[in-house]
Amino acid sequence: MAHKVTSANEPNPLTGKRLSSCPLTRSGVTEVAQIAGRTPKMEDFVPWTVDNLKSQFEAVGLLMAHSYLPANAEEGIAYPPLVHTYESLSPASTCRVCDLLDTLVNHSDAPVAFFEDYALLCYYCLNAPRAWISSLITGMDFLHILIKYFPMAGGLDSLFMPSRILAIDIQLHFYICRCFLPVSSSDMIRNANLGYYKLEFLKSILTGQSPANFCFKSMWPRTTPTFLTLPGPRTCKDSQDVPGDVGRGLYTALCCHLPTRNRVQHPFLRAEKGGLSPEITTKADYCGLLLGTWQGTDLLGGPGHHAIGLNAEYSGDELAELALAITRPEAGDHSQGPCLLAPMFGLRHKNASRTICPLCESLGAHPDAKDTLDRFKSLILDSFGNNIKILDRIVFLIKTQNTLLDVPCPRLRAWLQMCTPQDFHKHLFCDPLCAINHSITNPSVLFGQIYPPSFQAFKAALAAGQNLEQGVCDSLITLVYIFKSTQVARVGKTILVDVTKELDVVLRIHGLDLVQSYQTSQVYV
C-alpha cells in the first residue's frame, strides 16, 4: 500500500504556496539558498562522529527496537515493523525520507546550511559500506540535522516509529535508491527499471520468496557487446575473456573500474597529510557499539565461532555499555538482533558465514579495518608457494602466526578474532556485496578530521550537486541484489545459472576478481 504524499500541485497549507515537486535538486538548492540568505554561524556538523550518536541515544534505542524480526513467525503479517518494511519496498510507495524532507523544507525557511549538511551526509554515505552499522549511524546523523535546523518541527523525538521512518527508509534513501544523486532526464527511465528490480528482489530477500513470473534471461537488459566500452585498462586477453552478452547500454557511461576509480578531492586533514600517519588523530570508532548490540545474538555465536563477550578490551567502553542498556522488544527475535537495519534484513547462517558480514561492519566501525584486511589479504596470497586452498591458507595464518595480533587497536583486534576463517574467505574472495563494500569504503572520509579552510567551500559545492558521484554503477549493485536474493530465496536452477554467469562477467568488467558466483551461492550466504 502506498502512503499518501502531498502533491506538487496542492497549495502548502501553511504558506499557501505550491510545493516543489523535487525540493532537493540542484536548482531547488540554489533557489532555496537565494531565498534563505545567510544564517547565523552554527557549530559545524560532521557525520560519522560518535558524539552525534551519543546525543541521540534514546532515538538509537527506538530505531533498534523497531528493527527486530518477530519472534513468532506466524505473527509477522501483523508485526508493525515488518508491515512497514514491506510497504516501503512496494514499487507503488513513495520514499518516506523524501516526503519528510519535502514537508520540512517547504513548510519552513530552511537555511543554506541545512542543504550543505544534508549533502555532506550524502557524500559520507557514498564512501561508506552498505552495512548494519552504516544504516544506524546515517539514521542518527540524519536526525541530528533535522533537530538542528527544524527545532520547531513536532514529533522528531519519536521519528523512528512504524508508519513514520524506520531502517528500511534510511537504507532506501541513502544506500539503495540514493535519491540525492543528480540525474539527467535521459537516465530516468533506465533508473526506474533498475529501481524496480532492486525493490522486487529486496522484497524477495525479506520474504524468502522469489518474484513471480520473472525470467532473468529475457528481462535483464543486455545488448550487443564491445570490449572497447569497458572501463579501465584492458589487454587483448582481457577482451577475449569477456563473453558475448555484455550489454553496451548497461556498462558504459555510468560504469566504474572500482580498484582504479578516481576519488573526488576532499577537505579531510587525514587524507591531505598522507593517509594513516600516526600523528594525525582520527575520530572515535564504533566497535563498542557492535559488541554491545550483538552480544547474546547468533551473529558470532554458535558452532565454529567464539561467543561474544565484553572482554578486557571492551571493559569501560561507553558505547558498549549504552548498547547493552537498550531494551529489546519482547515480541522481537533476540537471536537475530536488530537485523532489519542490515542489507539482508535478517541473520541467516550457512557454513560458518552470516548474512550480516562482521568484516563489512568493521569497515564502517573502525578507521583501521580496511587497511588491516588489505594487509591480511596480501599475506594470504603471498605466504605460500604451493597450491594450498585459500580457506586453508586463512586457517593456517590465523592458527600458526597469530596474524591478527599485530592490529594496534585492541577493540578492532578483539572483533576480528571473533570472526571465523569462513568470514574472511567470504569477505575477501567470494561475496560480491562484500567486495563492493570493501572497494568503496573510504576511511579517510568516514573517520578523518576536518580541515577547516576548505571545508565550507566543499560543503557548498556538494549542496550545488557537485562531487556527488555514484561510487558503484547502478547496474552492478542491482545485479548483486538479484544474486543475494538467490542465496536466501528459492529460485530455479536456470535462473541461478543465468544470474551467476552474468554477474561473473560484470564483476570482472568492474575490476573485482572473485571466485565464481555460483560457488559463492552454494557455499555461503
UniProtKB/Swiss-Prot annotation:
Keyword set for this entry? Host cytoplasm, Host nucleus, Metal-binding, Zinc, Zinc-finger
Q: Where is this region: Zinc finger 1?
A: 95-179
Tell me the disulfide pairings in this chain.
none
Task: List, as start-end ranges, the regions of compositional bias called Polar residues.
Answer: 1-12
| Binding, Zn(2+) 2 | C357, C360, H427, C434
Pfam families under this entry? Answer: Herpes_env (PF01673)
Q: Where is this region: Zinc finger 3?
A: 255-510
* Segments of this protein annotated with the region Disordered: 1-20
Zinc finger 2: where is this region?
Answer: 357-434
- UniProt GO cellular component terms: host cell cytoplasm; host cell nucleus; viral envelope
- Entry keyword annotation includes Metal-binding: yes
An annotated Gene Ontology molecular function: zinc ion binding
| Secretion signal span | none
Q: Where does Zn(2+) 3 bind?
A: C255, C256, C473, H510
Quick one: which residues bind Zn(2+) 1?
C95, C98, H173, C179
Location(s) in or outside the cell: Host cytoplasm; Host nucleus
Keyword Lipid metabolism annotated:
no
Function statement = Plays a role in efficient localization of neo-synthesized capsids to nuclear replication compartments, thereby controlling cleavage and packaging of virus genomic DNA.
Similarity section: Belongs to the herpesviridae UL32 protein family.
Q: What is this protein called?
A: Packaging protein UL32 homolog
- This chain's source organism reads Epstein-Barr virus (strain B95-8) (HHV-4)
